[in-house]
Amino acid sequence: MTYSVLKYENSRLEVLDQTRLPGEAVTVELSDLPSVEEAIRSLQVRGAPLIGLTAGYGVCVALRGAGSASEARSRGPEVLERLSKTRPTAVNLFWALERMEGCLKGLPEAGWFEALEAEARAIHEEIKIQDSAMAGHGTSLLAPGARAITHCNTGPLATGVLGTALGVLIAGHRLHGGMHVFVDETRPRWQGAHLTTWELANHQVPHTLICDNSAAALMRTEGVDSVWVGADRIAANGDTANKIGTYSLAVNARHHGVPFYVVAPSSTVDLNLPDGAGIPIEQRDPAEVTAPGGRPIAAKNTPAWNPAFDVTPAELVTAIVTEHGVHKGPTYDLAKALGR
């Protein structure tokens, strides 16, 4: 089955509604700024690179009714501000919005909307190049017949192209064959169960779904060669914010001597943060924990702590894979590694 995660044609933005997977693949149009905001907040689109890409095209959608470049520049700050508040942890969102802001400031009077669209398309093209490069670097760390664990969803659904960590595993299976991927269910939103298994099935990669709390037992009794995760924000020292549960997985991997790899484009690296202590962590609705899918599973009025992300210390990360190459730990100077 082929599927399109995001399409922008004739000034119309369409995305695959990921909240309806794996049951049905439904495309929805994001026709105005509120629909773009809601799509990002509600996880119709998710994954740091795809959030940024959606926001980039979302600026075009929000401003396509402007009558002139000056009107677009006047309305632009409010659009950028509103989109910046949708998901605070994913630094790719802010990277894309900064790109669109720079474009807005320099808009020509003639062909201004085409210039805005061209910038969003340039972001899209960069993601394609980054994904391909990361897959090439990452597969060098995989052996034929590798058995890997992954967390959350980091495939095409997360970037709109090939993906980050899952993109490496899909590419590795195509290159070497014999891969087997163990997929954390990834509570409380079940991105592993709902999205990653769907993608692996579509790409015909052998896989097994596991409970989040069974990864350590799997490493101990069944044998795992490596763990692969993405990232929503990486500090300059390599501390990595990713979907909640990643930190636990890294601790388990270290205890069992299993390499732990982070795959993310350089746009996910926030060099303004020296370490992970300053990474903002999004807190989501407690009902995602107490009543997943609207079905109560806890006693009435039970409080729940529901951070969307946690931060894995750099010393637990074996290597960070970006489009620039494989950056090996246990210490990282990402500013130097990325040539910034």
Protein language model features and the residues they cover:
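SAM-dependent methyltransferases
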Residues: 1-9, 14, 113, 328-340
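C-terminal binding/interaction regions
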Residues: 3-12, 84-100, 104-147, 254, ...
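Acidic-glycine-rich active-site phosphate/pyrophosphate-binding loop
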Residues: 24-35, 144, 221-230
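Small-aliphatic-rich amphipathic alpha-helix that forms the alpha element of a beta-alpha
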Residues: 37-45, 51, 248-251
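Positively charged, low-complexity intrinsically disordered leader regions
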Residues: 1-37
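Conserved phosphate- and dinucleotide-binding cores of soluble alpha/beta proteins
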Residues: 178-179, 185-340
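Short, glycine-rich nucleotide/cofactor-binding loops
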Residues: 27-33, 155-159, 236-241
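N-terminal active-site beta-alpha-beta segment that forms phosphate/nucleotide-binding
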Residues: 44-210
